[in-house]
Amino acid sequence: GLITRFHERQSPESIYFRFFSPRPRLSERELEHFTRVDHRDRVAFVALLDDELVGVARYERYEGTDTAEVAFFVDDRHHGRGLATVMLEYLAAAARENGITRFRATTLPNNRKMLKVFASAGYEVASQLDDGIIDLAFDLRPTDDVTAAVDRRERLAEAASVRRMLEPATVALIDAGAGGPRSTTDPGRRPVPIEDGCLVRLAERLRDGAFPGSVTLGGPAALDELPEGVDLVVVAGPAAALPEVLDRCADRAAGAVVVLSEADASQTEAILEVVRRRGLRLLGPGSLGVCNTDPAVALDALCVEARPLPGTIGVLSESGEVVSSVLDHARRVGLGISTLVSTAEPADLNVADLLSYWADDDRTRAVLLHLGSAPLPSRFVRAARAASRTRTVAALASTARVAGGRPSPEQRRDRAMLRQSGVIPVASLQELFAIGRLLADQPPPGGRGVAVVGASRAAVDLAVDACAAAGLDPVTGHVGPAPDSLAAAASDPTVRSVVVIDTTPGPLPPTDLVDAVLGFSSDHPELTVVISAVGSERPARLVDDATGVAVPLFTFPEHAGNALGRLATAREWRSTARVYGDETPSGLDVDATRALVERWRADGGPDQVLELDASRQEQLLAACGLRVADRREVRTVEQAVAAAEEIGWPVALKARRRDRRKRTALSGVALDVAGADDLSATWARMEEALGPEGMQPVVVQRMVEQGLDVAVRIRRPDRIGTVEVGLGGPMAAFDPWELGVLPLALPDASMLVAASSVARALTDPLTRVPVVSLVHRLAALVDAVEEIHEVRADPVIVAGPVAWITDVRILIGSPRGELPVRHLG
């Protein structure tokens, strides 16, 4: 079978490294051993390429322990692609889910490839040489190094997949409804009927645009004549024929396939089945194509009339209808594009993949995203944060609403993902283009200080107000001739950008003003310079042909001020991201928390969700530097009185089944219980209302000083964890909690609290510090330990400099969400 053929294809050296002895064939006993798994103590993953096995990874638990032996065997033809490392990720995740905390492996000293697998995975490997054999062992807990290594490999693989699509050496244009080959680089070959006119136009555009690679135009049969490893295949034709064409693309090891044709839901699913089974990367269905204006690439595979100008702005649109308008407007305003991708509704390649590519693309200074209604992928936050740390990313997202005018949960989550990733959210294409135009010609502002200069006091004052409304700090407004007012603005060290106001009539600014502004921008490259014509229709930019210096021109000062303000905010995000990054809060012992949760999970089955009792809650919270207000669990009135005497009166009495929104004995929560008699009477009323099952166990808790009730809930329903903050206790039912996502850095926690109802009650930012710290710590805890499904702290009493957790619910279980599909690039 598969394993036998796989084994017999490998070199004697590879077989020796795997089995420590020559073994040209596997025995029946060995085959039976290698194919027997129980999905718990014996687990194996295989990698398939078409119908052939190209890799095997397996673990086998040492009986009665939480340690397993791990082994890999990768096809000789696929060494060096990272396959073993990716399979180790899957094995480790499966092992952790099954209660295995440690892997061991044995290898020969000269098997450097296997040693490299463990090192590149980020694990701290202990090794020992014994009798010519290296014994390796490492802990499976996902440390920061392991997580960082996984993220790094994922981003590199994503970028590599996109690179073959946007920087191809070979392109095939395939009409799924035609047959036969025709090479545009060999005009002597007999042409065949090509029904799709767009493909013919693409072939002509690639030829006319000096694409340096080879281009083949034809039907599906043309794929059979292509050399293996064609970089980009663009397909159009009947949707029903697409799965077969994609299979042929996979036969030729195509790097990426762009599907121009529309497809309904069932047809898209059939297409995706081939993509997943064959390991293809797909753009579409319904894409309008891609382009790369780098002269060395010269890829224009867009099915629209307009052609992009070369430049430094990356563009992604999830709406095919918008692409043509985007290109038309970009040409009209002189906006140069580095790469443009039309994804339609992304089925495979998506915004996260593109951001991973743009994060390392030297030609791209800024990225403009037009996002449709599809939910953002789980990888978006990490990919966008990586890109936003080095360049500006702005996004126009769908504003569709559900009935009642409220955003859906998915939309709330997507907005949080945009906010926390450093992406600039905009509300219109005009705002999106304003940011792109500014960054295409000028550096982003180095701060919020702005000087406004012009010849009209009224116009300057209007622009000063517009800049202030955009969140900028107008340093001064200079009125006078351009050279003098510009010189005055440059002399102020707090000025980071300059807005020049032109109120002269006519289709063009005065020559002396143009010369002064362009000369000033050339002499002060550290400043961001823009010009506003105060309502007059003028050219979109001023350009000095001799020096290449360009200054964007905006119709209204509000447009210029708004773009500058948003870019200043993005700069501040980058600064805080460099300082804080995704660092773990001080006092959070990640290893200790993971060890605790793994030990407790052993009490239940692999699919069971456990609710932690009070003692375990306190242990877990203590490991992350948090404490619950002093409390005791009791089962009798006598124990409750004794606990209250120990804690100190007055106390709160809480039944197991309690309504946090109400605070009466009948609802299971009684406050300010002042003595033994009061406690006994309260206990009796509570037990009568709830019954014995609703009572036990009962919590006796010290009363904390009065303050604001806050609620924090962190959940991991799938691969995207959410963080909610709002008012707690009785007010929780009336307060729409503010939403964030994991990972949540300290600045993100601060912004989340500031955007919630908590900030309206705690108006002084200093009084929010304990809430921000608590939210940050709880979010870091859940993000670090994927077995924690939910933490709900409600109410948290904020009194002065302290945030007291008075009630908490914690659920743990197997990690949620399927392992993501990984691509090797």
Per-region residue spans from a language model:
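Long, contiguous binding/interaction regions
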Residues: G1-R163, P168, P525
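Catalytic-core regions of core metabolic enzymes
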Residues: D145-G825
